[in-house]
């Protein structure tokens, strides 16, 4: 998945790329820059965002990983911000994520694009497809007609996540109502900073 800015001008991706790394207070940012900054903050909390990495480096990291293992890295293509690299039965591959009108979605052929679900963040998109793969995958299935099945099942972490983060993931898998838990407000705030299961 590669994050792509769909703007008609040739410099739209460059402008979006510069906004992706924009720091500063939310009051100083345009709405689009604020959305991108929030998406980057969420992505940075995952532990599976690798930042700057080449295609070959991603392939090397995923070479011995089980099928379904994935990571997100910066795209080396100037029209895109991010790429998800995933291990398939045929080896590592890369997929695109498009960014348009404040939404993220998988890149696809034109006739399918309008049917693809859109998300407010990259992490929400990944979380959705990981959960969908858990629901659909019952075991190894032989590809038909040369088709390679793509499963997102397990992130490849840059380093071991903290115990706090693993606990947060476990709680998110068990409940969607954090505010109703008998926990201190500060802990509820921490849990709500990252509402995803992956």
Swiss-Prot record:
Pathway given in the UniProt record: Protein modification; protein ubiquitination
Which parts of the sequence belong to the SOCS box domain? Answer: 151-197
Could you tell me where this protein is found in the cell? Cytoplasm
Question: Residue ranges of region Interaction with AREL1?
Answer: 1-75
Q: Which residues carry this modification: Phosphoserine?
A: 30, 52
PROSITE patterns, per this entry?
SH2, SOCS
Cellular component terms per the entry's GO annotation: Cul5-RING ubiquitin ligase complex; cytoplasm
Biological process annotations from GO: cell surface receptor signaling pathway via JAK-STAT; cellular response to hormone stimulus; cytokine-mediated signaling pathway; growth hormone receptor signaling pathway; intracellular signal transduction; lactation; mammary gland alveolus development; negative regulation of growth hormone receptor signaling pathway
> Which keywords belong to this entry?
Cytoplasm, Growth regulation, Isopeptide bond, Phosphoprotein, SH2 domain, Signal transduction inhibitor, Ubl conjugation, Ubl conjugation pathway
A single GO molecular-function term is: ubiquitin-like ligase-substrate adaptor activity
- One matching Pfam family is SH2
Its main localization is cytoplasm
Q: After translation, how is this protein modified?
A: Ubiquitinated; mediated by AREL1 and leading to its subsequent proteasomal degradation. Ubiquitination is dependent on its phosphorylation at Ser-52, by PKC. Ubiquitination is stimulated by LPS. Phosphorylation at Ser-52 by PKC facilitates its ubiquitination and proteasomal degradation.
Instruction: Summarize the subunit comment.
Output: Substrate-recognition component of the ECS(SOCS2) complex, composed of SOCS2, CUL5, ELOB, ELOC and RNF7/RBX2. Interacts with IGF1R. Interacts with DCUN1D1.
What is this protein's name? Answer: Suppressor of cytokine signaling 2
Species assigned in the record: Rattus norvegicus
What is the primary gene name for this protein? Socs2
